[in-house]
Amino acid sequence: MKTLGILAISFILIFFSCRKDSFITSGDARVTITADTLKYDTVFVSTGSTYRTFKIINENNQKLRLSSLKLMGGAASVYKINVDGIPGTQFSNLEIEGNDSLYVFAQVNVNPGTANLPFILRDSIEISFNGNKRLVQLEAWGQNAHFFRNKVIAANETWNNDLPYVILGSLLINTNQTLTINKGCRIYVHADAPILINGTILVNGLKDTANRVYFQGDRLDEPYKDYPASWPGIFFQPSSKDNVFTYAVIKNAYQAIGLQDLPPNANPKLTLNECVIDNAYDAGIISINSSVRARNCLISNCGKNLFLVKGGDYQFTHCTVATYANRFIDHRDPVLTVSNYIGINNVPAAEDLTAAFRNCIFWGENGLVDNEVFTAKNNTKAFNVTFSQILWKVTSTPAFINPPTGVISNLSPKFDSINTSRNYYDFRLQKGGSPAINAGLNFGVTTDLDGKPRPAGLPDLGCFEKQ
């Protein structure tokens, strides 16, 4: 009897071992493919996308044999695939253990062409098993572009909106030279490519969305297209002068704009008219003893929105400066810091400071900040800071400033729509509900960030006029 029991157990073990080692051949085998389409956002010619992936899951206890897995476009396809790390265009007799899976990775590389409009690139992966055929579609948008690697503007140059501009390595504008960027241009900047301005840059956008000029990172695929710190930023060196940005959008940088030292002439080093600076990881504008004139600008969701230190000369009119902590940005710093000094090796270096903020909103939520406006003064240099017609979030009036006028403290501006979970922000004002409506004075600004008219009487605070 003991011998019979041992034989029975052995038979059972062998039976299940054979089942596990056998292949399921039924056309009804339970197989899950985790995607029916792999989509890629805009991919520039001569550059590759990131990999997209899907799994083929064998939900059976027995092994599954894929008779073939092939890239339908073959070797001529713009797509490249690999299966569990092995590259190729066609694979045969792939085995998947019971209740196991394999990974398929796909990447697209766009060949150069002449089209200036985005074009669609399609292919598919065919998976065959047990008489079944399944297709996973591949779909990408290709885009030709001007590619510049370590580009130097050594003579005056103009960029027009014929193709996007992709910056690799760096872009340098030499002293006394001017780069003019006309309406509708799109500038995509690689992760290691700062824009360095020793000379002058003129950005001539227009109010319509299609005619604004955009600066952003060159990763346009999900989820990277929304990441801050995707590229270094735009940096104005001591010799730079007479820079003007009109209807420009600068987003997803590390430091969107950095300025050092006053210009060599009496004009502002940088003028910003109707511009958006958004989602900068460290700072929207960081300025060290420099000069900025800003009108109708939105500086939103940055590590430090405005960081103006070691003096300088600043004027911000009808600007909305706001940050809501979200999954990309920890709101740990005030949206506005103004100081006439900076510590260098624990020694304060100070310069004269003049700053005026008129018809502006300074607001933040969901972070660690109670005072959204911070001021600091060194008594060895001038400190002349004025706030007129302001809505701000503070626990007390900032120190050292001139007596402010027309102040609204700690009342929510009631922006139109804020949804941090969806990463959606509309900083226009709620009609009839915002205390910023009709709270301004006429400082000669006749339109808003949308290009819509402001009244001759009492305008709204911030960059948007409620229509």
Label each residue range with its predicted role:
Residues 287, 292-428, 455:
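Predominantly extracellular beta-rich ligand-binding scaffolds that present long acidic/polar faces
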